[in-house]
Amino acid sequence: MRYNEKELQALSRQPAEMAAELGMRGPKKGSVLKRRLVKLVVNFLFYFRTDEAEPVGALLLERCRVVREEPGTFSISFIEDPERKYHFECSSEEQCQEWMEALRRASYEFMRRSLIFYRNEIRKVTGKDPLEQFGISEEARFQLSGLQA
């Protein structure tokens, strides 16, 4: 997937759902744990050197797995390349849990599944499709048949 660098930098400056200084180790062999400012914006996880305003990198949180490793640590890996893991170290177990939950909820697919679930729940209660008023109820992306388990 291609990204426009200026657009990514602009996105990295947007208000974050979560931000903290965490220990981070990249996927390369021999990579060491470094302190990084980590910032979750929509479905991107930006990471910065602690003394710089521009991100060092970004992870698109789609088709990824967030897994607890040791106490106070978690990793992010991607379905296409499960051996390529990014490791994060939190200051507490509570912080680790908060980050893992936020990262799991950040993907487009999670939001789509939630929308479909709540759409169906509202339809059961009211008998009406809540998306109909927006003129998007027939779009394929909002259909249960397009949902993969």
Curated annotation (Swiss-Prot):
Disulfide bonds: none annotated. Transmembrane segments: none annotated. Pfam families: PH. It comes from the Eukaryota. One of its GO terms (cellular component) is cytosol. This is Pleckstrin homology domain-containing family J member 1. SUPFAM superfamilies: PH domain-like. Expressed in testis and liver. It comes from Homo sapiens (Human). One of its GO terms (biological process) is receptor recycling. The lineage of its organism: Eukaryota, Metazoa, Chordata, Craniata, Vertebrata. Residues 15-108 form the PH domain.
